[in-house]
């Protein structure tokens, strides 16, 4: 999701402290057979755990670490410009909680097991009412590239998207020039569907993006044989 749905310049909410959900809520998430979004996740995202990675709700206290991780040139070059201050990330985190409560968006902090520092994010936004179709994206501190953190985190997010949000089609975009991002998407089973010409503006120029998609049926067909790491919801 190189075009992040958050627009800092359009966020006029000033009362960050009252808008933030500062208490982490975990709960049982029930998978439904129809494409109706469970209401549970809107009150607070569950903690998703793997062998090395835990994904949880963003908190105001994550602002400083996200600022350090996501504003470096190598991380930020292929995503919408991230906030440029710690305060800007606090505003972004407050916005993610409002959008989650509205039932249109979910954003997880990426942490390592045994450590609570946020080292990146995974996000999902609906592109069709009720999450029939959605778009997902990610940003991870460069120190954790090539370590398996993305792979495990992506598996957790995809499971959440298809089993909890009941997504039918999950899309992603990556700039053609973003070799690492394209490789990461292919590695988790995303299928390239085309190229969106000059669809993303960055640093004063328009870039072509590759459009990827994962369908629910395809994901269910391959997950049991290709994903070996155990993962679960923490209740």
Predicted regions, residues:
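Hydrophobic residues in alpha-helical segments
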Residues: 70, 79, 100-101
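A generic secondary-structure signal
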Residues: 95-99, 160
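Conserved GNAT-fold acetyl-CoA-binding loop/helix
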Residues: 74-95, 106-108
